[in-house]
C-alpha cells in the first residue's frame, strides 16, 4: 500500500516487488522498521523504571545540541504544512515523502546519539521526548494513509 501511495498518481511506474519489500529507501518496511525501532527504545527506557508520557512531551525537549538532532526537529516542524498541502492537492505521495524524510532524520539522529546511555537526566528526557514526538508523528502520518505500525518486526 505504501509503495503504491508513494508514487505520484499522474506518473506511470513499474510495480517492483523487490523494491516495495526492501528495508532500504522510501518503502513501507523501512518506515515501519523505523517506528518499531523507536518503540523498542521507549520500551527499554520503561524497563529501566522510567515513564514515557505522551501528553506535553514537547515541553521536555531541550534546544538541539547536534546537527542530526536539529535536522530531526526541523523535519518535525514541517508536519502541518505537508499534511495541508498533501490533502489540498490530493497528493498522498507528498505525505509519503515527508514520512520518508522524517524516518531518515530520525535514523541519522539515532546513529549519532546515545539516547539511552546519556548520563544527563534532563538531556536523556529531552531525547525521549523527541523520539516520542517523532513516533507519534510517524504513526499519525501512516494512519492517514490507512497503514498501522506493528509492535515488533
Residue ranges of predicted features:
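Non-catalytic interaction-recognition regions
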Residues: 1-153
Amino acid at each position: 500500500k505504501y509503495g503504491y501511495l508513494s508514487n505520484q498518481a499522474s506518473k506511470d511506474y513499474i510495480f517492483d516487488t523487490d523494491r516495495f519489500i526492501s528495508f532500504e529507501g522510501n518503502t513501507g518496511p523501512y518506515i515501519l522498521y523505523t517506528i518499531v525501532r523507536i518503540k523498542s527504545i521507549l520500551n527499554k527506557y520503561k524497563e529501566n523504571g522510567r515513564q514515557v508520557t505522551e501528553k506535553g512531551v514537547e515541553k521536555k525537549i531541550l534546544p538541539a545540541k547536534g546537527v542530526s538532532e536539529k535536522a530531526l526537529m526541523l523535519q518535525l516542524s514541517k508536519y502541518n504544512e505537508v499534511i495541508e498541502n498533501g490533502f489540498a492537492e490530493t497528493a498522498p505521495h507528498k505525505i509519503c515523502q515527508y514520512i520518508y524524510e522524517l524516518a531518515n532524520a530520525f535514523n541519522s539522529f539515532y546513529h549519532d546519539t546515545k539516547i539511552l546511555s546519556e548520563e544527563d537526566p534532563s538531556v536523556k528526557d529531552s531525547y525521549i521526548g523527541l523520539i516520542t514526538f517523532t513516533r507519534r508523528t510517524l504513526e499519525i502520518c501512516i494512519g492517514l494513509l490507512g497503514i498501522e505500525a506493528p509492535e515488533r518486526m
